[in-house]
Amino acid sequence: MENKYELEKNITVNAYYYGNVLEMTDTNPISKQSGIRPISKDEYIDLATGMTMKFNHQNKQRIQSPENLRKTFRNLRRLIIANFNAGDIWLTLTYRQDDGRPITDTKRVYRDFKVFWRRFVARYGHCDYLIVLEPQASGSWHLHGLIKKQKGKLPFIDNNLVVEPMWGQGFTMTKRLKDTDNVASYLMAYLTDIPKDEIIPGTSKKGNIKGARLHYYPSGVHIYRGSRGLRRPVKKKGVKSDILFDYGLSRDAKADAAFYHEHKIKNGKKISHITEFYDNVNNKKETNQARQDHD
């Protein structure tokens, strides 16, 4: 199916290569938040109904800017795609609150994970990890972690008998990623959207408010951390056709997917961008080389 949007082949683009995917955009893309529009630190407009609502946040810390968060999550998505596949492990680590007090100290959270990680490596050998903080409306933190063996695959890991005692701080969940898991997209939604009953007291409505969890991330917090062994996306800036050629593709190659983004800036003007994705780059490189050899 032909894409509705396409970058001109002679324009300058920012390109990222990760996990056999080539991503190109004519500028830094900014996703449009369609679920809510904040109008103050305490209120937002539900764009589906037009109603003004109040945030139910007990977390009083200064929030990060949405633009910085979206950039962070785009980088996080690329890291996930570059490093994790079917058979790797996804963990959720939470804190029990026996005294009703939320765990708000991120230094403690990362310190507790460091203790957990030493125990994990002692049992399973050299592994790589990527951990991500998830804020709750109460102000407390959860951790999500992706773990892979540096060589081979991890064996079956029992959540109740192994992971939960190893963590020792509260409820845990352990899942092995499947071929059908789009882990990057799922985790992005999990970390940015929030259930309606968590943010709107007493609501009987089901579902999530898109993007609402972004407003619980305080300024100055490092949202994710990864081990040194993770592969980092390769970033390039140049002419689109030249970058396609550099990765062994035809200068006229068509993207597998392309998306249009529009963003309003302070003076009322709009900035628009197109982002293209080329999947399975290595396979296409071999096909293109074979075609050239035949010619």
Task: State each model region's role.
Residues 1-139, 150-295:
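Right-hand nucleic-acid polymerase module
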Residues 143-147:
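Cys/His-coordinated zinc-finger cores
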